[in-house]
Amino acid sequence: MATLSDIDVDWAWSAFQPGESHPRGSAQWDLRGAAHLLRRAGFAASLADLNAAVSGTPAEAVDRLLAVDQQPPSFQQEMADLTQATLGTGNVRGLAAQWTYRILNTPVPLLEKMTLFWHGHFATSAAKVEDARLMLAQNELLRRHAMGDFSRLLLEISRDPAMLIYLDSVSNRKAHPNENYAREIMELFCLGEGNY
């Protein structure tokens, strides 16, 4: 079993190249390869996570990462309690701190990495939405669909109250249509400029 002193910081943060051996001459699937995989599919990894990954094959490590429905009930309860406490303050910054805690402690890092990816893709602003509950609901929507069908995610996000507020759909009227919602959904989020 590897120890923390076995990890060389320089190679741990260098790009992993399949087929390359470790600088010390060990096999390809080692701590370096596992560290690369877990950084790419998550945010970081503990030594225990690295040891668990190298104890099996690369395919088994990937299968564990893709098992996004494997959140222990204790973690789900901890997050529910933290969310309720945060929502009680009404502070959107508290939600950001709560999410950071979740990212750092999640047993399913790929799910949070994909939630963050979709959060960046379907951008909204808490300053414009001005409702912590709506921002939380949007984050939960992104998490629910993070690893699923893009068309379903797009449909759900197009109905999301935070997104509707952010894209000015609340000011859209028959006599005075606001094209921002349709343009953003079509052009920025799915088809690209001029492809609709």
Model-derived segments and spans:
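N-terminal module-boundary/linker segments of secreted carbohydrate-active enzymes
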Residues: 1-94, 103-105, 109
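Primarily short, surface-exposed interaction patches in extracytoplasmic proteins
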Residues: 28, 45-63, 87-196
